[in-house]
Curated annotation (Swiss-Prot):
Superkingdom field: Bacteria
Gene name as annotated: mraY
Protein name: Phospho-N-acetylmuramoyl-pentapeptide-transferase
Family as reported in the entry's similarity comment: Belongs to the glycosyltransferase 4 family. MraY subfamily.
Entries under PANTHER family matching the protein: PHOSPHO-N-ACETYLMURAMOYL-PENTAPEPTIDE-TRANSFERASE, PHOSPHO-N-ACETYLMURAMOYL-PENTAPEPTIDE-TRANSFERASE HOMOLOG
Native source species: Clostridium novyi (strain NT)
Transmembrane segments: 3-23, 48-68, 79-99, 106-126, 136-156, 174-194, 199-219, 223-243, 246-266, 298-318
EC number, UniProt record: 2.7.8.13
Length: 325
């Protein structure tokens, strides 16, 4: 437990130190965010805010891993791979947006191909590692499903879902950062309670790095995480849950991610089928914005909801074998 606390503090400080160094550099090289014209009017003033800020918490996390552990475990290495690999895809996407001076980087099929490649690599290594295998645990009922040959296709779909859902959540200052900070704290506790101490330390590191990044990303944001950050966070949330054999619990603790993704699916589906919109704008955080809610109120309420969902997540695991709080 003391190593977890130490890891949080180190990652937090490293993240804080990087802000004053990297943010001016992003300004200098004009790595500013292009705001989509169809977005909320209040977001227009954010145009030019530096993006790619996800590199702050990615670098902080990687540095801290090697500060606190000279020989990272297999689980830590796989989590770092997911974190960095998905982050690189986001970095490419962000770079193209800046080069083209538009809010469109990689084409949808290009991004999906890259996501599928990384997801396949992770799924293959997880499937062939005896400590992970092809089993997943079902929350509440505590039954184990062995997916066998369907495990890798499931993991590919799963990572496509988590990365895109977190990406959609990153639409307000501090929103994706706050939600994922809470989710990673949840996984740190679960990892510790199940004896996965290396993973517990890694989750603590990411949580600490996000806490430091929040100083620069909270309203009014000095920097956006960009796709660099949101895809990396979707990847690391997915990887940690996968290694705990708890990918299904993301549906519970990541309920905000799910709501954001579903709101887009429902909005698009309704408009194509009925010619009518369900929400004023999607993802759903924009609906609340256009309903008169301030960004900070939305972030606060969504964070409170996530705390409640994490408590429900703990309840769903209480009687699981090997789980002890």
């Amino acid at each position: 437990m003391s190593l977890m606390i130490y890891s949080v503090l180190v990652a937090f400080v490293v993240s804080l130190i990087q802000g004053p160094i990297l943010i001016p550099l992003l300004h200098k090289f004009k790595f500013g965010q292009n705001i989509r014209s169809e977005g909320p009017e209040s977001h227009k003033k954010k145009s030019g805010t530096p993006t790619m800020g996800g590199v702050i918490f990615i670098i902080s996390s990687v540095i801290t891993v090697f500060v606190v552990s000279r020989h990272p475990s297999f689980e830590t290495k796989l989590a770092i791979f997911a974190f960095v690999a998905f982050g690189i895809i986001g970095l490419i996407d962000d770079s193209l947006k800046i080069i083209h001076k538009e809010n469109e980087g990689l084409k949808a099929y290009q991004k999906m191909i890259l996501l599928l490649i990384v997801s396949s690599i992770i799924g293959f290594y997880a499937y062939n590692n005896p400590r992970i295998g092809s089993e997943i645990i079902v929350p509440f009922v505590h039954k184990t499903w062995n997916l066998g040959m369907f495990y890798i296709p499931f993991i590919i779909f799963y990572f496509a879902a988590t990365t895109n859902a977190v990406n959609l959540t990153d639409g307000l200052d501090g929103l994706a950062t706050s939600i994922t900070l809470l989710v990673m704290t949840f996984f740190a506790v679960v990892s510790y309670a199940t004896g996965n101490y290396n993973l517990a330390v890694f989750c603590s590191i990411v949580a600490g790095a996000l806490l430091g990044f929040l100083k620069y990303n909270a309203y009014p944001a000095q920097v956006f995480m960009g796709d660099t950050g949101s895809l990396a966070l979707g990847g690391v949330v997915g990887a940690v849950a996968m290694m705990l054999k708890l990918p299904l619990i993301v549906i519970i603790v990541g309920g905000i991610y799910l709501a954001e993704a579903l709101s887009v699916i429902l909005q698009v589906g309704s408009f194509k089928l009925r010619g009518k919109r369900i929400f004023k704008m999607s993802p759903i955080h924009h609906h609340f914005e256009l309903s008169g809610w301030h960004e900070t109120k939305i972030v606060s309420i969504f964070s409170i909801i996530t705390v409640i969902l994490c408590l429900i997540g703990f309840l769903s695991l209480i009687k699981m074998n090997g789980f002890s709080l």
